[in-house]
Amino acid sequence: MGPGVGDKSAVQRRKTGRTGLIAVVSALGMTMTLAGCGGDSVSPSDVTLKLVAADYGDSKANSSQKYWDELTKEYESDHPGVKVDVSVYSWTDVDRKVKEMVDAGNAPDMAQIGAYADYAAKGQLYRVDELLSIPVQANFVSQLSDAGQTNNTQYGMPFASSTRLLFYNKTLFSQAGLTPPESWNGLAAAAKVLKSEGVTFPYALPLGPEEAQAETMQWLLSGGGAYTDDVGTYSIDSEQNIKTFTWLKDELVGKGLTGPVAPAKLNRADAFAAFARGEVGMLNGHPSLMQAAAKKGVQFGMVPMPGVNGRAKATMGVADWMMAFKKNGHAEQIGDFLDFVYDDKNVLAFSHHYDLLPVTTSASEAMAADEDDQDLAPFLDQLPASVLYPVGKTSWAGISADIKKQIAKAVTPAGSPTGIFSSLQLTATAADSAS
């Protein structure tokens, strides 16, 4: 774990040290470039590219629109025949907005959203090898590149990524004489002591509908399982997965170690807010929690997720995606613009501003070597061993929604992990066969 982790000054130091760079380059972008495709050729002087992107900011002042405006201004100044029109929408609206545009026959040239598989399955997207220059395509972090594939062909380009770590409140741990846990039993023992010390949420277990699939996956991985097996087949009802949730039900939830709010009612945002108020001993978190906690003066540490008998061998990774639609052609111009977006300075600027991990190998190496980025180093260290959602499956969106609705029932007093996981498996198998 790098120095300065959980230290407010370290977060601020990195932020302020990057302001000049961020002002010059906006980087919400992932790239797709295309070597011209016959009839797709359009005179550069006639082209306006349409990009719909998600907003990673939490206020108007921090909106991703500002980044895109700066980025496109710089690009257009060197490419007078090409205009790039960027519309930024909240995460609540952006996926729906793109779907509406596509359904109406008005697909944007590019979309930076949460999922690509449905569009790829319908033949609406360019393949990545049709788009990106070879150096750019080869520069993606391999786990992220692999996750962008449907049927062994890459259509989705990683745009932003993050991993998860176990956050713990250093003050509460110090007062209780605890050290960070390395195993499940250690986590349960620490939670028991924290409860005896009056901590509201010894371990916060957000299985509410906001992001239950994420908390679930992190625990499944820590137990040696996952949503899919090594060949990509759904394995939700595996023995390891059922054992993991049986342990959660019996050893954490059943013993009152997850706080006064039922896991089914606790959303990630609420758990993060409680951590920032100093009410949580431990929880799984991603990089954005660092700033929220530091702003409130919470002293925290971060360690890899505990496993059954020691550190977990894998952690969860998350990526958002860029894709290019065939509808309007413009392939050559799209490709050139997106090669610019994927330049290291742009990838790093975006990552720095929103506390996300770079999606390219060269930018990741630059971040790892930069002393000002040591607060993100523990997350970056987890990326090579990370496992992502099975986003290449068109069935995943529906299965993820089912997990959000059902999974918390497995840890209720009357709940059956075996029953819930078996039901989810049946649904997943049927959906996968139909897709």
Role assignments for model-derived ranges:
Residues 62, 129-140, 201-210, 224-244, ...:
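Short, solvent-exposed loop/beta-turn-alpha elements that line the ligand-binding surface or hinge
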Residues 109, 136-172, 312-314, 386-393:
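A structural signal for short loop-to-beta-strand junctions that line the ligand-binding cleft
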Residues 74-140, 176-182, 272-274, 282, ...:
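Extracytoplasmic "Venus flytrap"/periplasmic binding protein-like
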